[in-house]
């Protein structure tokens, strides 16, 4: 969380942190840890959605990240779901906004607006990676919880 978070923590003050860095920590390890942290943040949001909507049989990735099989595999393995890359995944964010605008006009039926995106490919989870990520996520969740408390204390000191 580099600039605060709304879902599911609702804390504008939480920030990213690095743990267990030493003089032998490589640049690649730091870069990977950022990607893994973002994937865990996505998992937090995904879990919040699943808590109120169990209908998550298909999971699509959209935006620029959909161009990277590495990123798609990392996210899918983190959330324990195969990820679908649609033909229009790179347009996903703007297409979603356009669809919401169409629905707001009340001139379109949901069935006409929310059509299934043609599938370009599906990235299955890496079971070994998923097991490792689940263990790391448990620790990461503890760190986030602690960081939420620390962020609140730092805010008081700043003010």
Positions of the model-derived regions?
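Glycine/Thr-rich phosphate-binding loops that ligate phosphate moieties of nucleotide
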Residues: 1-159
């Amino acid at each position: 969380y580099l600039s605060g978070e709304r879902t599911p923590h609702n804390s504008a003050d939480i920030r990213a942190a690095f743990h267990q860095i030493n003089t032998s920590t490589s640049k690649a390890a730091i870069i990977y840890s950022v990607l893994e942290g973002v994937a865990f943040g996505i998992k937090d949001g995904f879990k919040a959605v699943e808590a109120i909507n169990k209908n998550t049989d298909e999971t699509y990735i959209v935006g620029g990240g959909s161009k990277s099989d590495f990123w798609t595999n990392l996210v899918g393995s983190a959330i324990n779901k195969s990820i679908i890359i649609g033909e229009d995944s790179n347009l996903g964010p703007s297409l979603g906004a356009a669809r919401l605008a169409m629905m707001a006009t009340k001139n379109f039926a949901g069935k006409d607006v929310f059509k299934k995106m043609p599938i370009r490919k599906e990235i299955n989870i890496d079971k070994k990676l998923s097991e490792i990520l689940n263990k790391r996520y448990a620790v990461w969740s503890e760190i986030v919880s602690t960081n939420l408390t620390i962020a609140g204390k730092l805010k008081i000191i700043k003010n």
